[in-house]
Regions:
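Residue-level recognition of beta-strand microenvironments
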Residues: 43-46, 87, 119-121, 145, ...
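Conserved active-site neighborhood of the chymotrypsin/trypsin-like protease fold
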Residues: 18-26, 77-79, 84-165, 248, ...
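Active-site loop architecture of trypsin-fold serine endopeptidases
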Residues: 22, 51-53, 101-103, 137, ...
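Glycine-biased strand-turn-strand hairpin within the trypsin-fold
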Residues: 18-91, 99-101, 112, 188, ...
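Short flexible coil/turn linkers enriched for glycine and charged/polar residues
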Residues: 110-112, 121-125, 134, 148, ...
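Gly/Ser-enriched beta-turn/beta-hairpin loop segments
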Residues: 67-75, 119-125, 165-169, 180-196, ...
Length: 361
């Protein structure tokens, strides 16, 4: 009897231990992947690209003068990633994934394929919104990219090197949030600001896919990586994602109007402050713009800006012309409703005014 009881206890202990091992394999990471994986998409695109004659490269400038290289449009196939963000089939991705596309096909885990409609694109933030025909799609929960901690888990899912098309499932890599609020300024017409940096491996084809936290919430859209050289394509653990809070705002605007409206009004007319004008006005300021008109009932008037004020700084940057003001606003991707900080010289004093950009009616 004692031997039987001992054997039973051993069996129970073994089974309990085995269950414990199996249970330990299910972590926050695996659960996060399981929750978001059904909503991760492979995006296959046919794009029109300029293709140059191969023999025209690396030639003597003499021949280039008489026989300039010629290009032609050619359909090229490429792939990227995306994430379904609603049960009615809206898909978020990068603009550069579907740029110049003549055909966009979306494949979901399991192999279901859909022709996607491009609802809208935004070149400046490098985001695009697609729509699948149908309903009751699996979709990802969107998190809050303003509530992140450096060092917390970050999981990248997507279609690196077209592997999704082979396995009919996304590839997942895990790392941490390495840094936040990374600003790269104006890059080839695009603005990459407040980017999330991660060491989760991101490779070619991951663009447009989700960066996920350990709760299974999308916190960013994977966009680009740093590589060892311009010829290397593999990840070295330095990848960047567009914060999901920005992506959500852009997607909502694309859903409504198909584009992002960046028109605005300052309610001001200004002229460059020249050396001659500064001497005539007898002011010590030699750099800035002078306000020559303030529109009645405008936000500028409400902010307390007056004719004759000399604006020297906008958002902490020195300015010398109205063009530089517009450049600062554009490169910060500011729109109507956003606030700009003005440093003003008036009657021997330096003042600070906050002007809300108005919409253009």
């Amino acid at each position: 009897m004692a031997r039987i009881i001992s054997s039973l206890l051993f069996a129970i202990s073994f089974l309990t231990g085995q269950w414990g091992v199996d249970e330990s394999r299910h972590t926050a990471i695996t659960r996060a992947i399981e929750s978001v994986e059904p909503a991760v998409a492979s995006i296959s695109v046919v794009q029109l690209r300029d293709v140059y004659n191969s023999f025209s490269r690396g030639r003597d400038p003499f021949f280039d003068f008489f026989f300039p290289e010629r290009s032609r449009k050619k359909e090229v196939r490429s792939s990227g990633s995306g994430v379904v963000i609603s049960p009615d089939g809206y898909v978020m991705t990068n603009f550069h994934v579907i740029e110049n596309a003549t055909e966009v096909m979306v494949t979901l885990p399991g192999g279901e394929e859909y022709e996607a409609e491009i609802i809208g694109t935004d070149f400046i933030t490098d985001l695009a919104l697609l729509k699948l025909r149908g309903r009751n799609f699996p979709y990802a929960t969107l998190g809050d990219s303003d509530d992140l901690i450096i060092g917390e888990w970050a999981i990248a899912l997507g279609n690196p090197f077209g592997l999704f098309d082979i396995s009919k499932q996304p590839t997942a890599t895990a790392g941490i949030i390495s840094a936040m609020d990374m600003d790269f300024g104006f890059q080839s017409g695009k603005i990459y600001k407040d980017m999330i940096q991660t060491d989760a491996a991101i490779n070619r084809g991951n663009s447009g896919g989700p960066l996920v936290n350990s709760l299974g919430e999308v916190i960013g859209i994977n966009t680009f990586i740093y590589t060892a050289s311009q010829f290397a394509e593999g990840s070295i653990g330095i990848g960047f994602a567009i914060p999901i809070n920005l992506a959500k705002d852009i997607a909502e605007e694309l859903k409504v109007s198909g584009k992002v409206d960046r028109s605005f009004s300052t309610g001001l007319s200004v002229e460059r402050l020249t050396e001659e004008v500064a001497e005539y006005l007898d002011v010590p300021i030699r750099q800035g713009v002078i306000v020559v008109e303030v529109e009645k009932s405008s936000n500028a008037q409400k902010a307390g800006v007056k004719v004759g004020d000399i604006i020297t700084d906008v958002n902490g940057q020195k300015i010398r012309s109205s063009r530089e003001i517009l450049k600062i606003i554009k490169e910060s991707d500011l729109r109507s409703g956003n606030k700009i900080k003005l440093k003003i010289y008036r009657d021997g004093k330096t003042l600070t005014k906050y002007l809300i950009l108005a919409s253009v009616k």
